[in-house]
Amino acid sequence: LSAQINSMTSPWYLHFMRYDPTASLKKIKCPVLALNGEKDIQVDADMNLTAIRQHISENGNKNVTIKVYPKLNHLFQTCEKGTLAEYGQLEETINPEVLKDMTEWIKKQQ
């Protein structure tokens, strides 16, 4: 419990919780690949990806690729619940489909 309290009161964590990325997103002009796991309990996929698409496209950037992966957690591992406790119990490091999609997206940008 003490370690959790310390991490949640650290300067980095407090800055991160207060940070609003809207202004930064509006400045992005390069191609963007935004991915989320459907079972990510740390970052809500719909809220996150909707905001990314909206704010990046406000500056005219239409090169935004968005994808939500069913049954994947924050670390892009196939999971049941998506909880932090489950991370260490999963054999998969990262789902192969995510790596494939990332590779294909990067190749298309060249």
Predicted regions and their residues:
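Alpha/beta-hydrolase
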Residues: 1-23, 30
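Soluble non-cytosolic domains of exported or imported proteins
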Residues: 19, 43-46, 92-97
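Solvent-exposed, polar/charged alpha-helical surfaces in well-ordered, non-transmembrane soluble domains
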Residues: 23-26, 50-54, 96, 100, ...
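Short beta-strand/loop motif that positions the catalytic acidic residue
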Residues: 28, 34-36, 40
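Loop/turn elements at helix/coil->beta-strand transitions in domains of secreted/extracellular proteins
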Residues: 29-31, 61-64
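Conserved alpha/beta-hydrolase "acid-adjacent" motif
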Residues: 41-51, 59
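Catalytic active-site module of serine/aspartate enzymes centered on a nucleophile-bearing elbow/loop
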Residues: 59, 65-110
